[in-house]
Design a protein with these regions (language model features):
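Pepsin/retropepsin-fold aspartyl endopeptidases
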Residues: 1-115
């Protein structure tokens, strides 16, 4: 679980997301979407370990983990992950843009831009 900062217009918020390399798209809770005043761009079906769910989709201006940042990224909006105590999933759409490593001693996720 990592702290993730989101920015959208004049709004920003931080949530604790589970790192999920198996998730194709980053998913955020409805609380995060509400704090960011995200507008739904429609709904789509997503298939995950818990089955098929309908999710709203929104566009976030910036998503940041530490110094790693991606601009204008589409996210799924759904509260199902909240049942596990997370505010979302940090998916491969974000993680795949970086080389990832885990520093076990410091208990940190290290994200380095791909060359």
């Amino acid at each position: 679980v990592v702290p993730v900062t989101f920015k959208n217009g004049n709004s920003s918020t931080t949530g604790y997301l589970a790192v999920d390399t198996g998730a194709a798209q980053t998913m955020v809770s409805k609380r995060i979407a509400r704090d960011l005043r995200l507008l739904s761009m429609g709904s789509q079906k997503r298939v995950g370990i818990g089955g098929v769910v309908n999710v709203d989709v929104g566009l976030v201006e910036a998503i940041r983990v530490g110094r790693a940042e991606i601009k204008n990224m589409q996210v799924s909006i759904h509260d199902r992950i909240m049942e596990l105590g997370y505010e979302g999933l940090l998916g491969f759409d974000f993680l795949g843009r970086f080389q990832m490593s885990v520093d076990s001693d410091k208990q940190v996720l290290v994200l380095t831009p791909r060359k």
